[in-house]
């Protein structure tokens, strides 16, 4: 089993895979008479294909045992997929570049409390992986006609460890 250690999630490290959603950066400004601060344009939701539309959903995820035994990844060919935690707890993010015959070697990240992610359209990624206790998330992804899910099962498992 190949061992992979998760590293901290940063905008720079995650850029090839999608967007980090947090209140960092300088693209923010006051709204509502100065009573609120808007952090603007943090990610791009993408929805393509027949009758495509952007959906907003919620999910309650159950934590996995660590180290995580990664045997499968998935991707969504018609749209991006964002996971925004509704509590200030970290979660595990696993992604892979596209290879010649499926996904390449996985990369693992651990979010800082309050960070969310937006997977690019057609990106191989692991399943939602809360840490320690159940966690609620807001999901922004694609609805419409056609199957927007492909799964790939690795011939050998990867073992994902926290730092």
Swiss-Prot record:
Pfam families: Ureidogly_lyase. Its cofactor is Ni(2+). Gene3D superfamilies: Ureidoglycolate hydrolase. It comes from Mesorhizobium japonicum (strain LMG 29417 / CECT 9101 / MAFF 303099) (Mesorhizobium loti (strain MAFF 303099)). This is Ureidoglycolate lyase. Its EC number is 4.3.2.3. Disulfide bonds: none annotated. It is an enzyme of class 4 (lyase). GO terms for biological process: allantoin catabolic process; purine nucleobase catabolic process. Catalyzes the catabolism of the allantoin degradation intermediate (S)-ureidoglycolate, generating urea and glyoxylate. Involved in the utilization of allantoin as nitrogen source. Transmembrane segments: none annotated. It catalyses: (S)-ureidoglycolate = urea + glyoxylate. Coiled coil: none annotated. Belongs to the ureidoglycolate lyase family. Keywords: Lyase, Purine metabolism. The keyword tRNA-binding does not apply. Pathway: Nitrogen metabolism; (S)-allantoin degradation. Homodimer. The keyword Lyase applies. One of its GO terms (molecular function) is ureidoglycolate lyase activity.
């Amino acid at each position: 089993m190949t061992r992979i250690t998760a590293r901290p999630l940063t905008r720079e490290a995650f850029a090839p895979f999608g967007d980090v959603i947090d209140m960092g950066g300088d693209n923010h400004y006051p709204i509502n008479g100065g009573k609120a601060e808007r952090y603007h344009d943090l990610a791009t939701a993408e929805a393509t294909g027949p009758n495509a539309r952007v959906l907003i959903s919620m999910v309650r995820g159950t934590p996995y045992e660590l180290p995580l035994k990664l045997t499968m990844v998935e991707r969504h060919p018609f749209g991006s997929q964002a996971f925004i935690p509704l509590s200030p707890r970290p979660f595990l993010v696993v992604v892979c570049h596209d290879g010649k015959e499926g996904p390449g070697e996985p990369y693992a990240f651990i979010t800082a409390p309050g960070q969310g992610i937006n997977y690019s359209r057609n990106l191989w990624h692991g399943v939602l992986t809360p840490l320690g206790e159940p966690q609620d998330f807001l999901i922004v992804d694609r609805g419409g006609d056609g199957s927007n899910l492909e799964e790939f099962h690795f011939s050998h498992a990867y073992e994902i460890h926290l730092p």
